Amino acid sequence: MKHSSLRRSLLLAGITLPLVSFALPAWANALPASVDKQLAELERNANGRLGVAMINTGNGTKILYRAAQRFPFCSTFKFMLAAAVLDQSQSQPNLLNKHINYHESDLLSYAPITRKNLAHGMTVSELCAATIQYSDNTAANLLIKELGGLAAVNQFARSIGDQMFRLDRWEPDLNTARPNDPRDTTTPAAMAASMNKLVLGDALRPAQRSQLAVWLKGNTTGDATIRAGAPTDWIVGDKTGSGDYGTTNDIAVLWPTKGAPIVLVVYFTQREKDAKPRRDVLASVTKIILSQIS
């Protein structure tokens, strides 16, 4: 992912596609007219393409907007990566404590945590935390290598029923986010379903599921996106992502003070390669979606 400090930008693909494309999953609910209008107006004013998937785990209702269209996931893929590591740790109890040494040649331009720990290395658990909470690109590549390569991450996604997630390249190449490029993409609906299974369902054992939630809740990069649109007394665990074409992404589980958790995936991408990130758009989407729940 490309960064200016800890901030991020992301992508665009196929802006002229209709609001809902292809066949939506069986769980797709009709989008309330007021929400459809608000999201369409926000998307139009921001001059980009917006994808949203929300699951209210309390009553099973969903809100979907362009949720079957592909978007470049950029660093939101690191959520799936960390989950794949946790899944492997279920059969390898010492995996998270395994010590990984790496070289200066392994360091990418965005490596805030791995650079600090170059002299003595890091454990797999520490690399996962760096990947989720600081979006450290070097940590992500080291974890992919530890799992056995890109195919291992994709195989894990398939194992939990996610047929849309596809990781084709390593960091930082996966962030080019070119329009209509299917590489390194997923759909909002697929990512929301996977988050629900991994953080709130039984795709992982309780200990691993709890650890994944802890990492998400400790994220340092999402204060201006979904968290900014949620009530301040709610707990939010998220993973942001960004790349070229001003793409700005966030995927999250929100724990209200009362009621069941909410899964929310927001992908946004723009028309120009050098477009600036729009974290404000993600915050606005969150407010629109949550207004339908309260």
Curated annotation (Swiss-Prot):
Annotated catalytic residues: 75
NCBIfam families noted in UniProt: bla_class_A, BlaA_Yent
Pfam families hit by this protein: Beta-lactamase2
Protein source organism: Yersinia enterocolitica
GO MF annotation list: beta-lactamase activity
Gene3D superfamilies the record matches: DD-peptidase/beta-lactamase superfamily
Protein name: Beta-lactamase
Miscellaneous information on this protein: The class A beta-lactamase family has a specific amino-acid numbering system, sometimes called Ambler or ABL numbering and often misspelt as Amber. A multiple sequence alignment was used to derive a consensus sequence and then the consensus was numbered taking into account insertions and deletions. This allows use of identical numbers, e.g. for active site residues, despite differences in protein length. UniProt always uses natural numbering of residues, hence there appear to be differences in numbering between this entry and some papers.
Swiss-Prot/TrEMBL keywords: Antibiotic resistance, Hydrolase, Signal
Reaction it catalyzes: a beta-lactam + H2O = a substituted beta-amino acid
S-S bridge residues: none
EC number, as in UniProt: 3.5.2.6
Binding-site residues for substrate, renumbered to this chain: 239-241
Gene Ontology terms describing biological process: beta-lactam antibiotic catabolic process; response to antibiotic
Family membership: Belongs to the class-A beta-lactamase family.
InterPro entries, sorted: Beta-lactam/transpept-like, Beta-lactam_cat, Beta-lactam_class-A, Beta-lactam_class-A_AS
Region forming the signal peptide: 1-30
